[in-house]
């Protein structure tokens, strides 16, 4: 913006240093290095360059700011406070305290103005790439020649640690290839990591690294010079190169505390003991948590300037809605909630022949869902041909086709997971992503953050057991499903036939308060007994009775996915006093009423056997000390899938034998 008051911005930068020092000192915990070293970056962005509205934090066309180096959270909280967001001085005083708005690392939903949950290094830059992708999709879908309602920038602040993490390379490679020119990376290049100087662990040329993947690079040698930073931002914002941008800022970690500045001791809270002298060095008064009247006045005026831009956009938006009622209706639909039962009605019942794999059933289910939810997008880590989650009526997302609904993430599972989170943070698109279940370990940190942040993403993970067969134990998950069930707020659904799969996808696409993981087979599975309606409705409750006993109940067989068929066959051999329960989603079943759970698994029947082609430990919560679990507590082997299953005891015959022991 014109008429830059550099004195005011420099004063604000120093006052955020004071806020950060006081907050970390009061908490006796936290990180000073980035908030002090990057204060001028904050001044250039929040005090001049970013377009935002603190009164409308979800404004559709705001610029996004993601703090990838989440340990520097006081940087963000300080600037949000000055910028007029609902982050008070009292909130800053409660930094890292119980139930505060200012947790140790930024958390989506907890703090107004925080765009992404960050802290695990590298996640934020991949989140930003996902957000930038979603912004491209939105612009492609909704902008017209007359009205550009989406033209924002996505800014992410990264440090040396973020860029050492492998996920960063996956993310920037995607961004460069897809020419995400709405992405601007600020690299706080202070040459220091927690343990030592960065030169002890890296010697790469950052300029060449980013240029090689398609970024336009600017190097700001005086990374604490506000004028240089603003100029660099404006150059990046108005670049005609069609490339994503990175501004490498050579900064001094913990600037303002000479005793630790420029060293690894400045990373954490070690500098707290020197803050009294630092306050004098920075020209700050002795008063703690001090913000001057001049700084508050500056930001009040700045907010008024931003409000003008906001109102201008609102006028354009109103014109756009009037001129494009169908597009306006589509945009509004992004915020509509959908019930699983309504989504499920869009999916025709399956013919009972031929038998098919649940991954194939998933493909058949995805097509009507994608028509019903036109703002849904689906991606894969170079496995669309195997995971079968390609939206057939949607083209590929490319620079030339930003409206494409199929995202080719490439063989970048970790970035895929974090980019999916970014698309979900954006909020307009329902995103799913696919790979083989065994490779979920590559993106588990992103799955965990999706669950923590209550992001409604959908994971479509196929080839879900030793039934994979010939590829062998490297590709045969055994511990994976149980491990994923341990993540709070993640619903894991392992359907047993196409009708259960229809309900599973409906649940996943309806869920708005967290992620859902679909575990699907490579191998064909028979249809379970019962009507499509019974199986679908039962799946919506997480677990249900597939085969009812016709004599006094003697035993309950519990299974998921490909093993339910063995329980059904075993029940035929064991007698009419056997009940078979399919439990595709234990998390959902656990959320049912006690009355319903007792109707399916009555506590009076303690003779229970659970069967799943994976580790056994998880299932004892359902079978109890008197029950048995048939599973696989070892790695698999390379052979045809049926042979591996038989060798490892995943058969109805083995189930019958164990039931008699």
Swiss-Prot record:
Gene3D superfamilies: 3.40.50.920, 3.40.50.970. Thiamine diphosphate binds at residues 71, 119-121, 161, 190, 267, 439. InterPro entries: THDP-binding, Transketo_C/PFOR_II, Transketolase-like_C_2, Transketolase-like_Pyr-bd, Transketolase_bac-like, Transketolase_BS, Transketolase_CS, Transketolase_fam. Binds 1 Mg(2+) ion per subunit. Can also utilize other divalent metal cations, such as Ca(2+), Mn(2+) and Co(2+). Keywords: Acetylation, Calcium, Magnesium, Metal-binding, Thiamine pyrophosphate, Transferase. SMART domains: Transket_pyr. One of its GO terms (cellular component) is cytosol. GO terms for molecular function: metal ion binding; transketolase activity. The active site is at residue 413. The modification N-acetylserine is found at residue 2. The record marks 31, 267 as: Important for catalytic activity. The keyword Magnesium applies. The keyword Magnesium applies. Coiled coil: none annotated. It comes from the Eukaryota. Homodimer. Belongs to the transketolase family. NCBIfam families: tktlase_bact. This is Transketolase. The lineage of its organism: Eukaryota, Amoebozoa, Evosea, Eumycetozoa, Dictyostelia. The gene is tkt-1.
């Amino acid at each position: 913006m014109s008429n830059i008051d550099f004195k005011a911005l420099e004063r604000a930068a120093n006052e955020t240093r004071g806020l950060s020092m006081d907050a970390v000192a009061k908490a006796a915990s936290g990180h000073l290095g980035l908030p002090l070293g990057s204060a001028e970056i904050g001044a250039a962005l929040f005090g001049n360059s970013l377009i935002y509205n603190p009164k409308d934090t979800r404004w559709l066309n705001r610029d996004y700011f993601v703090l990838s180096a989440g340990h520097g959270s006081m940087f963000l909280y300080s600037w949000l406070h000055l910028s007029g967001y609902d982050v008070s001085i009292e909130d800053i005083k409660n930094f890292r305290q119980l139930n505060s708005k200012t947790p140790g690392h930024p958390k989506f939903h907890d703090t107004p103005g925080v765009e992404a949950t960050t802290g695990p290094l590298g996640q934020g830059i991949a989140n930003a790439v996902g957000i930038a992708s979603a912004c491209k999709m939105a612009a492609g879908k909704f902008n017209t020649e007359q009205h550009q309602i989406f033209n924002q920038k996505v800014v992410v602040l990264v440090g040396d640690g973020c860029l050492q993490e492998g996920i960063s390379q996956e993310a920037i490679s995607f961004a460069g290839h897809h020419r995400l020119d709405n992405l601007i990376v600020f690299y706080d290049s202070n040459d220091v990591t927690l343990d030592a100087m960065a030169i002890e662990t890296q010697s790469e040329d950052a300029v060449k690294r980013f240029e090689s993947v398609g970024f336009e690079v600017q190097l700001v040698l005086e990374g604490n010079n506000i004028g240089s930073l603003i100029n660099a931002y404006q150059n990046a914002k108005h670049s005609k190169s069609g490339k994503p941008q990175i501004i490498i800022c050579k900064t001094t970690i913990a600037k303002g505390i000479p005793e630790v500045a420029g060293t690894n001791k400045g990373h954490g809270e070690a500098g707290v003991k020197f803050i009294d002298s630092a306050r004098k060095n920075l020209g700050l008064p002795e008063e703690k948590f001090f913000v001057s009247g001049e700084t508050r006045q500056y930001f009040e005026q700045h907010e008024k300037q931003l409000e003008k831009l906001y109102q201008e956009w609102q006028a354009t938006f109103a014109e756009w809605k009037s001129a494009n009622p169908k597009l306006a209706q589509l945009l509004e639909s992004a915020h509509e909630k959908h019930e699983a039962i309504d989504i499920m009605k869009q999916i025709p019942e399956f013919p009972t022949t031929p038998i098919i794999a649940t991954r194939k059933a998933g493909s058949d289910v995805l097509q009507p869902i994608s028509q019903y939810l036109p703002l849904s997008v689906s991606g894969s880590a170079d496995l669309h041909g195997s995971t079968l989650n390609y939206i057939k009526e949607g083209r590929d997302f490319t620079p030339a086709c930003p409206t494409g609904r199929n995202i080719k993430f490439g063989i970048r599972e970790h970035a895929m997971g974090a980019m999916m989170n970014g698309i979900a943070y954006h909020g307009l698109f329902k995103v799913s992503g696919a790979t083989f279940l065994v490779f979920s370990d590559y993106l588990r940190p992103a799955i965990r953050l999706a669950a923590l942040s209550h992001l409604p993403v959908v994971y479509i993970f196929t080839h879900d057991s030793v039934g994979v067969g010939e590829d062998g134990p490297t590709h045969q998950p055994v511990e994976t499903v149980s491990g994923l069930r341990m993540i709070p707020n993640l619903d894991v659904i392992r359907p047993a036939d196409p009708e259960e799969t229809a309900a599973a996808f409906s649940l996943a696409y309806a869920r708005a308060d967290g992620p859902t993981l679909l575990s699907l087979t490579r191998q064909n599975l028979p249809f379970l007994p019962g009507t499509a309606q019974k199986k679908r409705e039962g799946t919506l409750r997480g677990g249900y009775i597939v085969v009812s006993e016709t004599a006094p109940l003697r035993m309950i067989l519990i299974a998921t996915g490909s093993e339910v068929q063995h329980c059904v066959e075993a029940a035929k051999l064991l007698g009419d006093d056997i009940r078979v329960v399919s439990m595709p989603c234990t998390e959902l079943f656990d959320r049912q009423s006690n009355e319903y759970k007792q109707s399916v698994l009555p506590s009076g029947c303690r003779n229970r056997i659970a069967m799943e082609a994976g580790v056994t430990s998880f299932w004892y919560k359902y079978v109890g000390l008197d029950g048995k679990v048939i599973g696989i507590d070892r790695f698999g082997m390379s052979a045809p899938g049926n042979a591996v299953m038989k060798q490892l005891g995943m058969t109805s015959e083995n189930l019958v034998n164990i039931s008699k022991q």
